[in-house]
Amino acid sequence: MLIESMGLACFARPLQWFKSQWLWLLLSIAAFCLLMRVQVEWLWFGQFDWQGMLLRRWLWQLGGLLLALLVVATCQLWQRNWIKLEVASNLGESSLSLHGWRYGLGLLGCFVVVVGDLVLLSRLAWLACFKPFDLGHWWSEPFEDIWALVIPLSCVFISICVMLGNARGGRIAHLIGCFCFSISIARGWGLWALALAIPPTGIKEPLLGGDVSFGLGQFPALAFALVVLLAQLILTTCTTIWMKLAQPESLSDWVFKGLSPRQCNFLRPLIGIILLTLSALLWLSRHELLWTQNGTVAGAGWLDAHLILPLRSLASLAILVFAFLVIPFTWIQQRRLLRLIASIIGVGAILLEVLLAPFVQWMVVKPRELKLETPYIIRAIKATRKAFQLDSITTTLINPQPQLTQLDLEQGASTLRNIRLWDSQPLLATNRQLQQLRVYYRFSNAAVDRYRFVPDVANRQQVMITARELDQAALPKRSRTWLNRHFVFTHGYGFTLSPVNTRAPDGLPDYFISDLGTSTRLEGSSELGITREDVKEAVPIGRAALYFGMLPSPYALAPSKLKELDYPVGDKNIYNHYLGSGGVPVGQPWQQLAAAMYLFEPRLLNTGSLTINSKLLIRREVRQRVRAIAPFLEVIGDPYLVSTSVSSKDLNYEAKQNQYWIVEAYTSSRTYPYAANLPDGRPLRYLRNSVKAIVDAYSGRVHLYVSEPRDPIILGWQRLFPDLFKPLEEMPSSLREHLKVPTDLFNVQVQQLLRYHVTDPRIFYSGDDVWQVPKELYGRRQVPVDPYHITAQLGTQESSEFLLLQPLTPLARPNLSAWLAARSDGEHYGKLVLLRFPSQTPIFGPEQIQALINQDPQISQQFGLWDRAGSEVVQGNLLVVPLGKALLYVEPVYLRARQGGLPTLTRVVVSDGKRIAMAEDLGEGLRALVDGSSNKAVYLNRNDLPPIKAADQLN
């Protein structure tokens, strides 16, 4: 209009052509950028030969997008026909007219619904973009940013309506909602895929009779689909009505003349579909009763089964009937009366659930709660134990002798040989001062593991291994140039390996492997009967560069014309080039362009340092690497490094490589029927350590092995991506020997066991037999006793094995009730054993023993002398260890200077619950404990061990 009024109509068509050309240019640039990113992702997955899996993921997303676009196109078509119908029937008889405050209330209501819908859809789209595998439980995701969404969207909607015209504002709001809807459906591919692929478990939940797999797979997908569809349909309806309500003549007169009969009839099918969707959502919400917790019972209780479930079923059926009555079928008579009846029943059922349920709970359930809830408590106990594998625990009753004897020492000789005296924190503190060697190296954690140094000895030596990684954040500021960060400082190097049960003469850790590069030192231990050759044979070092690790690392480009820092030797640095097979090729100009656009890094195009063999190394943090390959798995906890040789028969492993990261991956669910949340409030009702990921520390190659083949969730993903996973039996045996039950899974099982070790519903209801994790004094702080690894015997007739152990005490009492032990060796991997102590005989727990230690006159006097001399006494983790037919309590004592000194292992305190002894080493302490420093043997050395029968060897 402005162009025509100025007499410039001749320029209108060229201007329109110019705008369309710019639009096509922008679309072409966007498509080209997308193509470059797709190419890099394709090549990245190509290094693992998993392009087929990536293609299937893209096809699932494309299918979801096409389905969403079909819904969006239908909504747009309906809206366009509505607008045409509005113009055509403008002179017809109208109804539903609004005047004055009623008109204002209608405008306000429509506005609130539109903004609320946009908030919900934009929230779901945000989750779909950044946390797509959390969409199945989007309702439990925190909504801290709700006002950050409401206020901007309200302002945007108002601005659109004011600046662009009210009708156009409604259209744009609808387009925004359609965009968010499409993103949510496309990015939610994991929900639809798993829902279609998850197999039935054969376990039926007792309330509705559905298979447990429905809650694990189908329910999250159906709930999300119905919610997002309902939001889209309501948005379409409200924006369409807004365009009618907010006409200029209506706003000026504050009067809405109403809708014509044809418009009302055209609106009814859409309202009917909305009601059908709402009915389906209400029907589905009956299943939600199975994983809600109100009061005593996890899952549906008596009130849910006898009141809420029937009311929801009734409300759903009433709304379903109402939906059919809204749709203008000619064969339905007395439509208005039937609609009134259906609406009264539906609304009444919903109101009764809200208003009547608290009264029935107070008046009917509470007075007879135990009797009414007993069947449901039994269901909750069984389901929770099943969901967290507590039902497979083997329970053993033990009654330890009150006093340690020489016979116990002889029977527990293999246990004594691996008593852990070094905690991870003192060892890390020492390593960081003695073994980091340069400011840019970092030891992130110390992992407990075991290695077989002597082939003819059944038990393996327990060790702590710490990887020496490169921490670019620690580089001096002058060294943080772009070339240094991405071309020179590309990797860490080597690791340290220490026995957990010995110390050097100065109190510092012993090392089997220390230092790095050509200065790497391999040492044996005469105390343990391990030679240098044993270490060299059992722990090959080989190519020790760590390009992939625990620490977040930026992308690296290697090999290049610039040499990479390999390791320092004295005042000099040794340089090398990356020779691994992993990485995205960037040797060609078009590959460099793709990498530059992928990384938003134009400097790649003119660096001049790349060669024809150069590769781009991205996702170098091993957990991020596993998540990128299998985003449907949860990667929890710290990975740990293993150094071992893999047989040449395993073609998928590089022959010269010895360092591998083991990463624990999980499947989980919040919708396992009748299972309880964690005691700490986390909404987790099912957990399996379903996958063990092996990541090559040099080349970054990833292998995924299924460790829980009966888990229905991982079985579903195996159906979808059969080439991605291998059975655990195909893992090289040298790596399988280093698998261990992850501490994170074990902690979750311990939390649930605190209450769900009880299977009697009466005792469970009364809460008389609840356990707790005991506390101990570590340094100067009282902390919960963390699970600890020991190599011990579960019975006097069994060989020692690698165990993860957690002592447990009764709630509010310090006596020891039980141990939960997780087995990690051979065919026993993953099995849980509960060692229960007699309730009538008090067994001292860690807190009581620690109190006795601190009350001992000689020990407290010695601690005071050290304290006055300027040293800080750190009492380490108190271990409670089964030994023969008795218990042994062991606590290491460290000394360090108050101002950041090195922790040194100075003393070892031992006790059997009656007597306490402190000595310079474990052997002396045990001799003093048993019979006052006698010369009888204490078996701490392999060479001192009595012969081991072949039948006692570990598998």
Swiss-Prot record:
This is UPF0182 protein PMT_0755. The chain crosses the membrane at residues 25-45, 58-78, 107-127, 146-166, 178-198, 214-234, 264-284, 313-333, 340-360. GO terms for cellular component: extracellular region; plasma membrane. It is found in: Cell membrane. The keyword Metal-binding does not apply. Belongs to the UPF0182 family. InterPro entries: UPF0182. It holds the Pfam family UPF0182. Keywords: Cell membrane, Membrane, Transmembrane, Transmembrane helix. It is a multi-pass membrane protein. The lineage of its organism: Bacteria, Bacillati, Cyanobacteriota, Cyanophyceae, Synechococcales.
